[in-house]
């Protein structure tokens, strides 16, 4: 099963992000936009795992989350991975407070014990809004995004994180919650 660990977004933030997607979509060429129920803040992409590892993984995540506090989150501004003419991913930025940095670091410390690998790049918290198809020219899209660089999508406090399964379907990926882990253990 294909899995990832994420912070779930409040409905108000999803609504604001969906409105931004609707504003940007007319400027986009060959972009697959995320639906509201697919929007999340990824902390760790695990990829394919055996179901037999879930109890051990859940135990480790419970341990990590129990030792950490809730995480203040602030989604604001738009950006992209790739270059201006040919972006690969369109995203909303999320600030990196110390609590989120500790959560991300603590998770990966445990995940490495299970053999998972991470990019050693700096963690760049973001919410993926859309993925551009190969060779799509989207200069007009990135120009339109320039007007929304400081747009606010919401502030909230993440009190838990979720282990999800990503199951492909003909209508796109379906994200299934496998387990929630309370931050602070309360």
Q: Which residues does each predicted region cover?
A:
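Histidine-dependent nucleotide/RNA phosphoesterase domain, centered on the 2H-phosphoesterase fold
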Residues: 1-186
């Amino acid at each position: 099963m294909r899995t990832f660990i994420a912070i779930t977004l409040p409905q108000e933030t999803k609504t604001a992000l969906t409105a931004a997607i609707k504003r940007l979509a007319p400027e986009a060429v060959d972009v697959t936009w995320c639906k509201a129920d697919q929007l999340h803040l990824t902390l760790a992409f695990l990829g394919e795992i055996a179901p037999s590892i879930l109890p051990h993984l859940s135990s480790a995540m419970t341990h990590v989350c129990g030792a950490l506090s809730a995480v203040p989150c602030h989604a604001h501004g738009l950006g992209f991975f790739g270059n201006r003419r040919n972006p690969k991913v369109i995203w909303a930025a999320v600030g990196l407070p110390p609590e989120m940095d500790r959560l991300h670091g603590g998770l990966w410390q445990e995940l490495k014990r299970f053999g998972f690998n991470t990019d050693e790049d700096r963690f760049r918290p973001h919410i993926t809004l859309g993925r551009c198809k190969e060779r799509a020219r989207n200069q007009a899209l990135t120009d339109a995004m320039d007007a929304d660089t400081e747009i606010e999508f919401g502030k909230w406090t993440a009190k838990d994180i979720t282990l999800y399964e990503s199951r492909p379907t003909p209508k796109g990926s379906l994200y299934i919650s496998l387990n929630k882990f309370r931050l602070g253990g309360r």
